[in-house]
Amino acid sequence: MDQKLSKLVEELTTSGEPRLNPEKMKELKKICKSSEEQLSRAYRLLIAQLTQEHAEIRLSAFQIVEELFVRSHQFRMLVVSNFQEFLELTLGTDPAQPLPPPREAAQRLRQATTRAVEGWNEKFGEAYKKLALGYHFLRHNKKVDFQDTNARSLAERKREEEKQKHLDKIYQERASQAEREMQEMSGEIESCLTEVESCFRLLVPFDFDPNPETESLGMASGMSDALRSSCAGQVGPCRSGTPDPRDGEQPCCSRDLPASAGHPRAGGGAQPSQTATGDPSDEDEDSDLEEFVRSHGLGSHKYTLDVELCSEGLKVQENEDNLALIHAARDTLKLIRNKFLPAVCSWIQRFTRVGTHGGCLKRAIDLKAELELVLRKYKELDIEPEGGERRRTEALGDAEEDEDDEDFVEVPEKEGYEPHIPDHLRPEYGLEAAPEKDTVVRCLRTRTRMDEEVSDPTSAAAQLRQLRDHLPPPSSASPSRALPEPQEAQKLAAERARAPVVPYGVDLHYWGQELPTAGKIVKSDSQHRFWKPSEVEEEVVNADISEMLRSRHITFAGKFEPVQHWCRAPRPDGRLCERQDRLKCPFHGKIVPRDDEGRPLDPEDRAREQRRQLQKQERPEWQDPELMRDVEAATGQDLGSSRYSGKGRGKKRRYPSLTNLKAQADTARARIGRKVFAKAAVRRVVAAMNRMDQKKHEKFSNQFNYALN
């Protein structure tokens, strides 16, 4: 009974499941009901499992405790008698002993313990004084918030509050820094916006100011807005007689028309009092308005006109007149896109994260809207040409060349003049055939250069010519140097083809020469930097060096012999292996002589083959270790693949269902750590450091100032 109880507790607590197995839990309850001794033993086993450094084991053990606590008075007495230790193991009330990993299971354990203790106090708090005191201790001393869904302790809440305060402080500092940056850069941004707006107004003389009612880029003209306002019969102050300075830059179709309330064809509405008075200035304005409307063919204010501008017509064509403006606009827009707009977006993000600096946030949002509006204008105007600066430069250069060419006067060519006479017509003109131009020029250059070198007495050509003058004239060819017969020539060619060819080396350089200084080394007895002995230094002859200058090492790998045999081991499909390896087949091992059916000819090889077949028959094909490992990884069950592993079993986990705490998370830091701190990498680093120390020791070991380090 005791062994069965221990086995049930171990299986339930090490299952790793979020819920307990109902059948095993039913058996455990049945054993605990049998006697108080078994109940006490179950309590001790559960407390032992609660001390394990694994949160999943503690969670399962607490679930068993919760099931038994509400059903047995004796079990409640055992738990309440050691209630403080129970809370430390399940709730983590001791900051020095936090709950073990994994973190998710520890969080579930803390939440379950908080709910259970609160429920136990409501049901059994009056009957068990220690339980009520423990609940009071948790609420008032440990400051456990039972309404908190995360069931955090006081220490955890303090840590999180400190962490949040630290983050708030960092965000506040960043927001203050952003505010200072905005104060410093606002003037620069405003001047940049003013500059690019001025460039746009000079490039395209339309009013591109954003309309407060719409977000268009000024596609609709101001004329339609004025007509709509006059049609609605709105009464407002007219424009003064002084013209707007911007009216001169606008076309006549987009000029704002002053509202005329006294026009007889205008819509209904109250007439202003100024109209009743016979002011001559008002009459002049009315007459000017009527004349302006009639001259443009409008005739009335009771209808509106929508002027649509083609988007293709807004693209700026680059020429010499607007080249400087386009360059300035391009530079400014590049500055906005690469510097100002990212900075403004960063300011908005910092101000939004802090929640304060409302005025700064509003100002940053306005700046962002203005910058984005400018970029949209740039995109619609398409002021950047496709050809780039190189094409513009070439065009300007061609224009300058054309201007320079205009200074010359064109003279007509003479009739019948031939600047070049073809080769086939040269005899008709009484001229000789022209030699190859390139050959003549090349020969002249070579001859001129040789003459110059010979005339220089310090040159090698002059010295060579001097030696040739002193040498006797060459004698006639000897009979031995006569041309050989065809048979001798063939024999000589065959011998030359059979003769080995070796690269040029030191041995050929000193071939047949006596080397008086070969292998001699000057040996000095004193190694001091300043004091030298007065006697003559000795010379030591090294025979190895002399031999190196007269000999050569030639590696003879032998003659290549192709493989003539096959593996001929039987394959699963019934055919024989046709690999031609020299000694060993990578699939069937050492190559041995076999007959036509694949059986080894040597009796020892045949016996070894039979033993291997018997071992293979003992293990079915479905028990392939690789296949079983794949199935185990997919199902989580142990199928015994380690028993068939040929390289050793390895260390088996005791509870494979639990989360492996030793397994590292597959993060970039962990992967880099595995590569950097691998045993082979550490050995390489240690070996390299040892070599560096050895070189330093060999170089400075005899100097006293380095010997102390």
From Swiss-Prot:
Chain intervals for the UniProt region annotation (VHS-like): 2-145
Comp. bias regions, Basic and acidic residues: 1-10, 386-395, 592-632
GO biological process: protein ubiquitination; response to UV; transcription-coupled nucleotide-excision repair
Compositionally biased spans, kind Acidic residues: 280-289, 397-406
Residue ranges with Basic residues bias: 646-655
PROSITE patterns found in the cross-reference section: ZF_UVSSA
Protein location: Chromosome
Entry-annotated residues carrying Phosphoserine: 281, 287
Keyword terms of this UniProt record: Chromosome, Coiled coil, Disease variant, DNA damage, DNA repair, Isopeptide bond, Metal-binding, Phosphoprotein, Ubl conjugation, Zinc, Zinc-finger
Cross-linked sites for Glycyl lysine isopeptide (Lys-Gly) (interchain with G-Cter in ubiquitin): 414
Record GO cellular component, one term: nucleoplasm
Protein's UniProt keywords contain Ubl conjugation: yes
Composition bias, Low complexity: 477-486
UniProt-annotated stretches for the region Disordered: 1-20, 230-289, 386-406, 469-495, 588-655
InterPro entries per the UniProt record, alphabetical: ENTH_VHS, UVSSA, UVSSA_C, UVSSA_N_a-solenoid_rpt
Residues at which Zn(2+) binds: 567, 577, 585, 588
Taxonomic superkingdom: Eukaryota
Regions annotated as coiled coil: 165-199
Zn finger (UVSSA-type) location: 564-591
Molecular function GO terms recorded: chromatin-protein adaptor activity; RNA polymerase II complex binding; RNA polymerase inhibitor activity
Post-translational modification: Monoubiquitinated at Lys-414 in response to transcription stress; this promotes efficient transfer of TFIIH to stalled RNA polymerase II.
Similarity remark: Belongs to the UVSSA family.
Binding partners and assembly: Interacts with the elongating form of RNA polymerase II (RNA pol IIo) during transcription stress. Interacts with the TFIIH complex during transcription stress. Interacts with ERCC6. Interacts with ERCC8. Interacts with USP7.
Biological role stated in the UniProt entry: Factor involved in transcription-coupled nucleotide excision repair (TC-NER), a mechanism that rapidly removes RNA polymerase II-blocking lesions from the transcribed strand of active genes. Acts as a key adapter that promotes recruitment of factors involved in TC-NER. Facilitates the ubiquitination of the elongating form of RNA polymerase II (RNA pol IIo) at DNA damage sites, thereby promoting RNA pol IIo backtracking and access by the TC-NER machinery to lesion sites.
Disease: UV-sensitive syndrome 3: An autosomal recessive disorder characterized by cutaneous photosensitivity and slight dyspigmentation, without an increased risk of skin tumors.
Protein name, UniProt field: UV-stimulated scaffold protein A
Organism: Homo sapiens
